[in-house]
Amino acid sequence: MKIAVVVFPGSNCDVDLYEALHSVCHADVEYVSHRQKSLAGFDAVMLPGGFSYGDYLRAGAIARFTNIMPAIIKMANEGKPVFGTCNGFQILTEAGLLPGGLKRNDSQRFVCKTVPLEVVNSHTLFTSHYQDHERIALPIAHADGSYYADEKTLDELEANNQVVFRYATENPNGSLHNIAGITNKHGNVLGMMPHPERAVETILGSTDGLRLFESLLENGRIKVEA
């Protein structure tokens, strides 16, 4: 299984994501520039956190129009795994690969801390190594992390089990329904504001993010080999 980590101007978590996959999980992973137009040969793609294009207009709004995005959308439509954390999540919503959007935190401040999460759906490509309703702790670091969608969309997300992670004991940004991460209807696209790549080794304070990558690698290999 070969994974692409896309690098946009202003990405600053691409190295974290790459090292979590390469150094900790020993996965086959490569950096891919936003200028490229093809993801041929890759089985999954990941969009890192950061401040693509300085978050001008809206977080992720400009990155959505880069050369690489049609290839990412193509992979998503083919059912291949697509993952976005923080700014990556924002880009996925701007591209229409995930419903809703991310707006400024209710506090109007940048929030950087580790928060407790509930695993709401462990039956996805990305969460099979977790248990439903399990409590985990992952870091967040964002100013525009408040998830918003209209009531119809929220009802559909809940009915289709598309809410994967929820803020457990406190809502750090004002996200509706305490949503921290969602998938598309097919379950192959996941976006989340917390940073699992920052919680893959004990020295980092938590390994709760490691199982997300282990889930993806195990399920992705099964799909590729099939």
Swiss-Prot record:
InterPro entries: Class_I_gatase-like, PRibForGlyAmidine_synth_PurQ. GO terms for biological process: 'de novo' IMP biosynthetic process. Residues 2-226 form the Glutamine amidotransferase type-1 domain. Its EC number is 6.3.5.3, 3.5.1.2. Gene3D superfamilies: 3.40.50.880. Pathway: Purine metabolism; IMP biosynthesis via de novo pathway; 5-amino-1-(5-phospho-D-ribosyl)imidazole from N(2)-formyl-N(1)-(5-phospho-D-ribosyl)glycinamide: step 1/2. It catalyses: N(2)-formyl-N(1)-(5-phospho-beta-D-ribosyl)glycinamide + L-glutamine + ATP + H2O = 2-formamido-N(1)-(5-O-phospho-beta-D-ribosyl)acetamidine + L-glutamate + ADP + phosphate + H(+); L-glutamine + H2O = L-glutamate + NH4(+). Coiled coil: none annotated. The active site is at C86, H195, E197. GO terms for molecular function: ATP binding; glutaminase activity; phosphoribosylformylglycinamidine synthase activity. PROSITE patterns: GATASE_TYPE_1. It comes from the Bacteria. CDD domains: GATase1_FGAR_AT. It is found in: Cytoplasm. SUPFAM superfamilies: Class I glutamine amidotransferase-like (SSF52317). It holds the Pfam family GATase_5. One of its GO terms (cellular component) is cytoplasm. Keywords: ATP-binding, Cytoplasm, Glutamine amidotransferase, Hydrolase, Ligase, Nucleotide-binding, Purine biosynthesis. Part of the FGAM synthase complex composed of 1 PurL, 1 PurQ and 2 PurS subunits. Part of the phosphoribosylformylglycinamidine synthase complex involved in the purines biosynthetic pathway. Catalyzes the ATP-dependent conversion of formylglycinamide ribonucleotide (FGAR) and glutamine to yield formylglycinamidine ribonucleotide (FGAM) and glutamate. The FGAM synthase complex is composed of three subunits. PurQ produces an ammonia molecule by converting glutamine to glutamate. PurL transfers the ammonia molecule to FGAR to form FGAM in an ATP-dependent manner. This is Phosphoribosylformylglycinamidine synthase subunit PurQ.
